[in-house]
Amino acid sequence: AIGFDGLNDPDIVAR
């Protein structure tokens, strides 16, 4: 899943 900063999903954290 795609989670920006872990908001949606803690899989991919993009800051």
From Swiss-Prot:
Its main location: secreted. Signal peptide: none annotated. Keywords: Carbohydrate metabolism, Cell wall, Chitin degradation, Glycosidase, Hydrolase, Plant defense, Polysaccharide degradation, Secreted. It catalyses: Random endo-hydrolysis of N-acetyl-beta-D-glucosaminide (1->4)-beta-linkages in chitin and chitodextrins. It is found in: Secreted, Cell wall. Its EC number is 3.2.1.14. GO terms for molecular function: endochitinase activity. One of its GO terms (biological process) is polysaccharide catabolic process. Disulfide bonds: none annotated. The keyword Zinc does not apply. One of its GO terms (cellular component) is extracellular region. Belongs to the glycosyl hydrolase 19 family. Chitinase class I subfamily. Defense against chitin-containing fungal pathogens. This is Endochitinase 1.
